[in-house]
């Protein structure tokens, strides 16, 4: 690796005859236009540039969720434990796709990724081939949502480019399209990272579309926030029941769902989403 902060081997989508010195310089000055992988012998990391690490995969446990924010995104299962149809916008290293494919055998997953170079790295991250349960599309996420059929149980939005959160997927119209395509008890889950003032506006627009039925929790170790938006009318979490349900999910899926419930309940009672949304006004 040419980076002081990361040791290991760099994997790039380049021909064998490409000049290593030029590629190294492009990586360091952030002019290299494609995603790349760093393999340190224990994990593989997907980078969009030296400052933006998007995904991590443990080589010993490639189907586990290595990053805390991805674990918390699965918190939607507390409210919709048996989804039949999941749409993920933004493939990254495929962590969420692999987890859902392996641990939720009854679900159909569509992952929509705009960058063909990200999809080209799917084998490096052990993303399974397409089949009757999995479909990975190279397409625009907003266009896909506008044309797909209704009845999605969960939309997982983890859409970042080399500059951060994709602005094309931040409009009120886009979130209204998602709302329309969700099933009656469907959930939108959004990974928020980067500049707080920017994603505060995203929170506000989602709250407007989903009638304030939104919970936002922080992921302190990653610096991310996870947003859950609920289509169900008169959504009212039953926290005591959810605490018991969380223990069942932890036993089945191996994630700390009781901790997720604790954070969600606290954030809900403190109106954390509303407070964060005010930053964007």
Give names to the regions the model predicted.
Residues 97-98, 166, 199-200, 238-239:
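Short glycine-/acidic-enriched loop or helix-start segments at secondary-structure transitions
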Residues 1-41, 54-60, 77, 227-281:
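SAM/dcSAM-binding transferase cores
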Residues 2-3, 9, 28, 44, ...:
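The AdoMet/dcAdoMet-binding core of the Class I SAM-like
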């Amino acid at each position: 690796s040419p980076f002081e902060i990361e040791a290991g081997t760099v994997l790039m989508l380049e021909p064998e005859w490409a000049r290593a010195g030029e590629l190294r310089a492009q990586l360091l000055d952030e002019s290299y236009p494609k995603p790349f992988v760093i393999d340190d012998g224990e994990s593989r990391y997907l980078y969009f540039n030296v400052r933006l690490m998007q995904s991590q995969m443990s080589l010993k446990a490639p189907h586990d969720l290595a990053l805390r924010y991805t674990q918390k995104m699965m918190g939607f299962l507390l409210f919709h434990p048996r989804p039949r149809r999941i749409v993920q916008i933004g493939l990254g290293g495929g962590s969420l796709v692999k987890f859902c494919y392996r641990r939720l055998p009854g679900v159909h997953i569509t992952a929509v990724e705009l960058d063909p170079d990200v999809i080209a790295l799917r084998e490096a991250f052990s993303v399974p081939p397409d089949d009757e349960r999995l479909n990975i599309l190279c397409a625009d996420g907003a266009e896909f949502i506008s044309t797909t059929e209704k009845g999605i149980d969960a939309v997982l939005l983890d859409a970042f480019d080399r500059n951060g959160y994709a602005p094309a997927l931040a409009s009120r119209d886009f979130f209204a399209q998602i709302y329309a395509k969700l099933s009656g008890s469907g959930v939108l889950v959004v990974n928020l990272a980067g500049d707080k003032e920017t994603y505060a506006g995203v929170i506000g627009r989602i709250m407007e579309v989903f009638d304030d039925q939104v919970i936002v929790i922080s992921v302190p170790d990653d610096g991310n926030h996870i947003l859950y938006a609920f289509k169900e009318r008169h959504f009212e979490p039953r926290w005591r029941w959810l605490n018991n349900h969380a223990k069942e999910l932890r036993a089945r899926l191996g994630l700390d769902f009781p901790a997720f419930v604790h954070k969600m309940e606290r954030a809900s009672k403190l109106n954390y989403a509303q407070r964060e949304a005010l930053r964007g006004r």
